[in-house]
Amino acid sequence: MANKKMILYQLKIDKFKDSNETGYGDYKGLLLQIKYFQFLQIDGIILNNILDYYKNAKSLAEIESKYGSILEFKKMINIYNSNNIKMGINLDFNNLRDTFNNWKQAKILHENKNFTPNQTQKNAFEKYIDKNNKENDIFLNQTEFLDFYNKIFDFYLNLGCNFFVININNENSKNNNINEKEIDLIKNIYKISKQKNESFEIIIKTKNHELHKIQASQKEKIYDFLFIDKFSEIGSDKTYKNKLMIKFKPWQLLKELRNYLSYEDVIISLASEHIGRINSRWGDELAFNKEASKSFALLLLAARNSANIYYGDELGLLKAKIEDYRDFNEFNYNETKRYLETKNISTDIFYNSYLYQHSISVNNIMPWNLEPNFGFSKIKNKKFIFAENSKQNNVVSEFNDPTSSLNFYKYLIEFIKNKDFEEILNNGKISFSKDVFKKGIIKIKYKLQNKKLLFVINISKKSRKIHLSKKYEIIKSTYHDKKYLNIPNSLDPFESLILLKK
């Protein structure tokens, strides 16, 4: 995967596809959907850390009845690998001690699978589980954490996984600067991983490109890719830890993205698992939902950077359909509401922000079709949270609609992998026009000899005047049915173009 632009797809296993009518997405369910990723031509998939399933588990049956067995997970991984799709794990170093304890619990349950839960607790639990209550700081005791990492690495390597996305962001940190201890840890992680398996990829999740500058000053590599998803926070009030929604300013997103678009080893994710759907927060929930989703696809895929698609965004999914505040399933909901009331923030503003911002909007069930539970599960009498436009924007409906967001994603991925455009995309000089940022527009231009390829991406809800050379030819638009007799002098809301000049 190194030194080559790649397209990743991030998902939650338990929300993706249920194969056994338990109401939980499982390993077999994910395997059943392999053709979906072949259709999209995805290079790799980021999975949630399955060791989390073992937290407080009393028996293997409890886990395997929901998600499947470790052998089923390994089979699923191997089949994806044999189809040239890499499989990786999202690993949060802020919770590495918890992951290590979960690994030990998994070890206990597998070693004692013929015992009763009480026997397992008595004979093995105390022996293995780490009850150390030290502060969970990955940089305080590096030796200990490297030991944790070794065990977890071996576990996933033996299951056939190909890469880690390692989160080193500390939410409690007062700044995003990387210190010497952090750099030293990253170096050691990379060295350990490559010694065990040279082809295993280390992707570091960070909030800025400082590591990119540090890498340039090093004699040896310290990571394979950077992963940045901080952009999802734009349009949120950081004063209240992203609980409140503020006005989205398209130019702000373009300005932030500009620094990362030139690098194949930087993976950009517009969305993240921690905050609501970008199609609702940044796009248009009414007339221009489809066009907005396509424009975000262009923003993600048109430049030289690698990219991560968060599951459901390729369908143009909107925020979750919430019927009651209890659907948020948040223990401190009322406490947060009362606190914000003391700051003169009304209940209506608070609740509306939750509808758009809450992570449940990006972590609900994947809609496959119009069958019960949108094809996610055949279980009856169980309530699921789903996107409010799942009836219109599910995989089958999108697949059958040539104007859909899903088919536009497929077109774009095929386009950037097309041999006819490979040379200019890989070897052409890339430039970005900043003069139209204030309008919510970015121009990404590739030039190779006399050939020019231009992406004009409008993420504004308003029509915008724009000047484009009449020598270009339009080869694709986010407005599927619009007929262009000439190069336009203005763009409609979320109207974005791909143009070519030979």
PLM features per residue range, with description:
Residues 1-472, 476-502:
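Active-site and adjacent substrate-binding regions of carbohydrate-active enzymes
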